[in-house]
Structures are given as C-alpha cells and as structure tokens.
C-alpha cells in the first residue's frame, strides 16, 4: 500500500544502537494512504507525486524494452514537460548479489545535483525526504511516480528482501551520482520492512 508519513526531526534521539534508535523515533504527525492527500502534502514541499495507470498486458519480470514501450506515451510526456533526456529501467531482485550493497548505499542520507525521478513498475521501496525540520517517508508501490528536486536530502530503503523495478529519468546522461551528507539520521527512522509492518498493524 502506498503511504505517506510525516515526522518532526526534533526528538528523534541519537542512540547508536539501531533498534533503540528506531524505537526513539517520534510519532508520525500525519499518516495517509490516500493518493490525493499524498500528492497534496508532497506538493506543498516541492515534491511531485502521481499515480500512473497500470499496464495489465505487461508481464511480471518484463525486459527493459517491453517496459519502455508500454509506458512510451507517459515517458514522452514527462520528458517534454520536465526536460529529462535519459530514461532507463533498473531492476533489483532477491537473489541479486549486489542487492545488499545497494541497500547500504541508498540508505545513507545523500543529495543529487539533479532531480531523482522514479516510476515503480513492480514492487515497492521507501523514500525518506529530510526537508527542514521534517522527515517525510513515502512508501512507493507499483504505478507510483515521484520526482525529488535536486539538492533534497533523502535516502531510500529497498528492504531486507528487495524485489522492485523502476523507470529512472535523468537530465544528465551520466546517470546516478550522489553526494553523501554523513548524517546518521536514517538510523533513527523505520526502514521499509518496519514501516510496512506498522501499516499492517495499524
């Protein structure tokens, strides 16, 4: 389930132990799974969010060419309106050797010199956006499109058992490049698995 949670950064705690740090995270100021509310809340903070129509004819595990063809008109519209020059497909699967390394890298707070724009074709992931004195956690699932402006402090968690596929949009043909803040803030907030568990329990 797609969900947005908004936390205040103050009072998150500074414990070194990961479990106690997560437990010390503040209560969410807002929690919603309503797509319109999610879009509206993110928009006020400069984040773009949309739900794209599903492509029922696209099989699970489809190749890059099939995915790009299925979403060609929507991709072209985004490129025309936003100026993104390069588009590719990234798939991370459970048995992928580099999965744990990628998770460790993406979970560190970082920034980009250009927008981070993703459309979820399959699976899910958690974007955490550190904006002023707030942390906004967005669980994105299939058919979610999100655009995070350049310079926004954020991190991404794919979970302990990753399995997702996204379309990535870039203005720079060089692809993904990050500047890490070395702020351990991500340790003080739930990761994807705990966030989804909390959603189920709620």
Swiss-Prot record:
Function: Catalyzes 2 different reactions between oxygen and the acireductone 1,2-dihydroxy-3-keto-5-methylthiopentene (DHK-MTPene) depending upon the metal bound in the active site. Fe-containing acireductone dioxygenase (Fe-ARD) produces formate and 2-keto-4-methylthiobutyrate (KMTB), the alpha-ketoacid precursor of methionine in the methionine recycle pathway. Ni-containing acireductone dioxygenase (Ni-ARD) produces methylthiopropionate, carbon monoxide and formate, and does not lie on the methionine recycle pathway.
The protein's name in its UniProt record: Acireductone dioxygenase
Pathway: Amino-acid biosynthesis; L-methionine biosynthesis via salvage pathway; L-methionine from S-methyl-5-thio-alpha-D-ribose 1-phosphate: step 5/6
Organism field: Synechococcus sp. (strain CC9311)
Presence of the UniProt keyword Metal-binding in the record: yes
First-level EC class: oxidoreductase
Record family assignment: Belongs to the acireductone dioxygenase (ARD) family.
Catalytic activity, as annotated: 1,2-dihydroxy-5-(methylsulfanyl)pent-1-en-3-one + O2 = 3-(methylsulfanyl)propanoate + CO + formate + 2 H(+); 1,2-dihydroxy-5-(methylsulfanyl)pent-1-en-3-one + O2 = 4-methylsulfanyl-2-oxobutanoate + formate + 2 H(+)
Protein keywords: Amino-acid biosynthesis, Dioxygenase, Iron, Metal-binding, Methionine biosynthesis, Nickel, Oxidoreductase
Residues flagged as site, May play a role in transmitting local conformational changes: 115
UniProt-annotated site: Important to generate the dianion, residues: 118
Cofactor detail note: Binds 1 Fe(2+) cation per monomer.
Quaternary structure and interacting proteins, as annotated: Monomer.
Binding positions for Ni(2+) per the UniProt entry: 110, 112, 116, 154
GO MF terms held by the record: acireductone dioxygenase (Ni2+-requiring) activity; acireductone dioxygenase [iron(II)-requiring] activity; iron ion binding; nickel cation binding
Site, as annotated: May play a role in metal incorporation in vivo: 109
PANTHER family given in the database record: ACIREDUCTONE DIOXYGENASE (PTHR23418:SF0)
Pfam family, one: ARD
């Amino acid at each position: 389930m797609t969900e947005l949670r908004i936390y205040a950064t103050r009072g998150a705690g500074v414990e070194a132990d990961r479990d106690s740090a997560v437990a010390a995270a503040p209560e969410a100021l807002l929690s919603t799974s309503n797509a319109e509310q999610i879009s509206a809340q993110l928009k006020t903070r400069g984040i773009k969010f949309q739900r794209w129509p599903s492509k029922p004819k696209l099989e699970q595990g489809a190749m890059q060419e099939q995915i790009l063809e299925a979403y060609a008109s929507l991709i072209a519209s985004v490129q025309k309106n936003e100026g993104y020059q390069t588009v590719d497909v990234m798939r991370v699967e459970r048995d992928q050797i580099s999965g744990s390394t990628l998770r460790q890298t993406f979970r560190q707070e970082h920034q980009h010199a250009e927008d981070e724009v993703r459309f979820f074709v399959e699976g899910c992931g958690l974007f955490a956006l550190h904006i002023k004195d707030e942390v906004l956690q967005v669980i994105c699932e299939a058919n979610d499109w999100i655009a995070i402006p350049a310079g926004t402090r954020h991190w991404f968690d794919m979970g302990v058992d990753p399995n997702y596929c996204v379309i990535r949009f870039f203005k720079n043909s060089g692809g993904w490049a990050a500047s890490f803040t070395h702020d351990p803030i991500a340790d003080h907030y739930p990761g994807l698995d705990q966030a989804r568990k909390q959603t189920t329990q709620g």
